[in-house]
Amino acid sequence: MSEEISPNDRKFITNLLTQKNQESLLLSIGDKISKKKNKKPSKRIILITKNRIFFLKPSQNKVKKDIHLLDIQEIKSSTSNEFTIVAKVDNKQFSYGLITNKTDEIINQIRVTFNHQFFGCPEESTFKCTDIKDSRLVEIEQKDLPCGGFVETYQSICDHLGVPPRDDICWDMTNIISSKNIRSFNIGEIELPTSAGDTIRCLLGALKYNNYFKSFNFNNYTFNKEQFGYLAEVLKCNSTVEDLSLNNVGLKHDTMPIIATALSSNKNLALTAIDISNNQIEDKGMTAFSSYVASSLRGIASLDVSNTNCNKAGISVLTNALKKNIKMSSTLSYLNLSGNKMEADGSAGLSSFLASPNTLKTLNISNTTPSMETIVGALVIGCAELKTIDISDNKLTKKEVPHLVRFIGASSTLKHFNLSGTKVPVENLKELVVAITSNIYLQDVVLDLKNNDLGIAGARMLASLATDKLSNVIYLDVSENDFGDEGVSVICDGFVGNSTIKKLILNGNFKQSKTKSRPSAIESVISLLESECPLETLHMTVGNSKSPLKADILSLIYSLATNSSLLELDISGHQMGPKGAIGLGKALQTNKTLHTLIWDDNLTTAIGFAGFQVGLERNLTLKNMPTPLNDIIQCHREPKFQQIWKEIDSCINRNQSPTRAFEGNGGNSIGATNLSFLASGQQQGVEKLLNKIKSIGRKVTDPNNILIVKDAESTEKVIGGIHLIKESIHASLEMELNQKLKDFVQVVNDVINAKKNEMTQQILESMQNTFQSMDGPTIKRLATTIQYGSKDVDEQQIHSTLVKGAGAELSSRAHECFISALDIASDYTYEKITIGLDSVFKDLILEESQAQNEASGATPIPDSPVPTRSPQPTSPPITPQPTPTTNVPPVTAPRTGAAAPLKPANPPPVSTTTTPPVSTTPKPTQPVSKFGAKLSANSAVAEAIARNMGGGAPPIRKPVAPEPEPEPVTPTKDVTPLKSKPVVAPRSTPTTSTPTKTPVKKPSGPSVPGSLSDAPESDSAELTHVTASRPHIASKRKPPTRRPRPPTEN
């Protein structure tokens, strides 16, 4: 009957739709059902849109009735020629009916439209269809709408309330939330105006009829009492939400009952996680909430009621409700009661729940003043699955510690133990730590001990347990414990031998007053990083101590250049200035493991950032670096800073992307080795030994020693050669890998196209078998359209993914393997060459000593400027003790000057078979052709040689201040009296008949600092870079060789 609508009416309808921003879904005309039986029926036009139903009187251009879909309560229709709509608008109920032969079409259109606009509306909230046979009702097809129709529902709610819908909310829901399959509704993602009452009401109204979201997050938005009522309506209807977070939303003792009542009334509620923390609920509000907890049909898995200003009464009611609900023992896994005052009554209520068998995995009772004895006893009985316990900020007494020790000993699942702020005495803390380490069932434990004022005593206690006791702790936080320089040094030295710790937090432990132990403390940190300890993360910020290390931290920065274990470093707040930033840049050029660096608040200037940027350009492993905002704020106005920071950010983005420099790099391989820097430390050691050998002034005659010296002189060439071999092999690998991946690009492209064709064929077959109306030509046209109209995989994209992406990662991993093999070969070579040169040096020293002894014992010394006198009968020469390798006493050294005895005319020859050779080390300025020092203390000298030169493993750490070493000089004929000095004697060797050469047993390792092998090679000043050699220990990860730290200034 739409043909009976006049053009004038149609024009009015068009204007109405434009004004209401609606579109027509159905337009018809009929006779109005009048309540008066004798009254003549009048015509009415019915217009159905997405949100409303309009009834208009023809030729009057006036809307007689306007009904929103949500206002409809019932539709009655006993016959297919008439229907009546019962609605309620502004709390006034009315009915409106029409007589029309399109009754069924109109009813079904209203049903379909309502279902489309309110897709998730529960059945009890929809209008009723009364007296309508099922045969008249069509089946409604369900559509897959973004976010379960949230946008349509939101727009309809806005229309119902007369509020303009926000296009940004609709766009976000359609293009972000839905496309990313995000099931959490977060109010923080929506930009709310200052007065957001209408927006919140519309959003909550849409959530009431939506089943898409499974989590509601309203954190930090303050609701008023009216808005809590709207939220309660949502919770009464929603049947899909599982996680409700109301952290800091303004809940109070008078609004909490509104929410609790709504939760209790919804029998279909699927809620399993509730967060009502940081609200002033108090005991009264907690009592109302506990009524829901006790009656929850499904139980609760996670419950957070922290900082709700509840006292023992409120906590007691809540814990009793947990025990009353039988579902809680099998569902509750997370319970947070922190920030409330439990005291004895609350502790008793909690223990009554914990004592029963339960599935609790995390318990947080920090800052609750609990009765530890009561709670711990319940933990031992019922909490067999507890993994995390937080008792921080509760002052522990000596009486309570044994109860915790008992719980730790009985646990087999504990992973995280938080004791921060408990001020537990050191001796009692040791009991707890020992209990953790003694429990063989506990593994990978996270131990938080920060802010306990442990001091130096606590540091010593932890250090004493670190090596062999803390075998199951992987994370240790000892921040803000007032260790000071000495304590930091002690705790780092203690963990050198630990084999499990992976993350160590030392924030805020340096005191404001710098002590003499500061360099030693920093050196201890460096030694910890270079040791066998598997430490991967180190945080050493200034913390709350406000005592920055400034320039003292530079040595730690420089040590990163050769560190091969640390993955994450935080040194924020130490005010190291631009010098530290430049040092970081230089260290990053050779560091190949650090991937996270945090270094804000270090007084870094634009010059410092520029130096850092230079190093970062040559580093491919640093991927995470939080923006140092404090330093940027201070220097963002400096010239060229913006460009510098853009380049730094570009380098970080490059490292985060897998498509790094792989092909077309002009021969600059990934992570190319800086040969001169890597080899300088060990190579200098070899050159130093060669110079010492030359300084003796004696020619090497032994064939084996000649080969050793020649090999040593070729070391630099050989090491350089193997580095070039590595670079060549890596370059060839990149070429081969590049070619293989390029060939594989075509293979992948063919596979994708084949699968696409297979899918197309199956689609066509399915459609041809299903749709009888589609003939062969139609299917053929569809196949052609798919073939030429659908999107193909770009071969260039496959090339980029495989060659530049996967290829770069594979090349980088292979390069790491090559570097590892190269390091082993280099270290082995230098070790063997150093041992050989050390042996040659000792042989030459022995030969020189023998020659000097023979010369001093057989030939008179002419032109002696010192007069001689007869020996005193009361002062006989000192007879030395026999050495372990001979039974004949060694020859007594002759005296010079006034104390020298008279020489016989024919001095007896010196027997080389019974007298071991003796050498001395005179002062550099004194001739040594005639020895005035006593040479009789051979046993002590031999012991010194065995200690300093005898092939033992070198020390792990380089000493802070090495002792000065004597310089050897060439013997001359002029002799002056010598003062008594430590005498360097040869090692004990088997006697031979050859007077000029004594076979020497080769030492088993390089010398230690302070031995003869560490003497300077000439009278010139000692080398600027001195690197202590490191032992070669067979282990999973070999500690790196200490190399010279890069200087930061000339």
UniProtKB/Swiss-Prot annotation:
LRR repeats lie at residues 243-266, 268-291, 329-352, 383-409, 411-436, 442-464, 470-493, 563-590. Serves as the scaffold for the assembly of a complex that links key players in the nucleation and termination of actin filament assembly with a ubiquitous barbed end-directed motor. This complex is composed of at least capping proteins (acpA and acpB), the Arp2/3 complex, type I myosins (myoB and myoC) and carmil. It has at least a modest ability to activate Arp2/3-dependent actin nucleation. CARMIL localizes along with the Arp2/3 complex, myoB, and myoC in the leading edge of cells and it plays a significant role in the structure and function of these actin-rich cellular extensions. GO terms for molecular function: myosin I binding. Residues 851-931, 945-1050 are annotated as: Disordered. Signal peptide: none annotated. It holds the Pfam family LRR_6. A motif (PXXP motif) lies at residues 959-963, 968-971. The lineage of its organism: Eukaryota, Amoebozoa, Evosea, Eumycetozoa, Dictyostelia. Belongs to the CARMIL family. The gene is carmil. Its main location: other. Keywords: Cell projection, Leucine-rich repeat, Repeat. It is found in: Cell projection, Pseudopodium. One of its GO terms (cellular component) is macropinocytic cup. Disruption phenotype: Cells exhibit a striking defect in the formation of dorsal, cup-like, macropinocytic structures, a concomitant reduction in the rate of fluid phase pinocytosis, a significant decrease in the efficiency of chemotactic aggregation, and a decrease in cellular F-actin content. It comes from Dictyostelium discoideum (Social amoeba). Residues 1033-1050 have a biased composition (Basic residues). Induction: Down-regulated by Pseudomonas aeruginosa, PAO1 strain and PA14 strain infection. The keyword Repeat applies. GO terms for biological process: cell migration; regulation of Arp2/3 complex-mediated actin nucleation. Residues 884-903, 911-929, 988-1011 have a biased composition (Low complexity). Residues 1-179 are annotated as: Required for interaction with capping protein. Residues 862-883 have a biased composition (Pro residues). InterPro entries: CARMIL_PH, Leu-rich_rpt, LRR_dom_sf, PH-like_dom_sf, PP1-Reg/Actin-Interact_Protein. The keyword Flavoprotein does not apply. Interacts (via PXXP domains) with myoB and myoC (via SH3 domain). Interacts (via N-terminus) with the capping proteins acpA and acpB. Interacts (via the region between the LRR domain and COOH-terminal proline-rich domain) with the seven member Arp2/3 complex (arpB/Arp2, arpC/Arp3, arcA/p41-arc, arcB/p34-arc, arcC/p21-arc, arcD/p20-arc and arcE/p16-arc). This is Protein CARMIL.
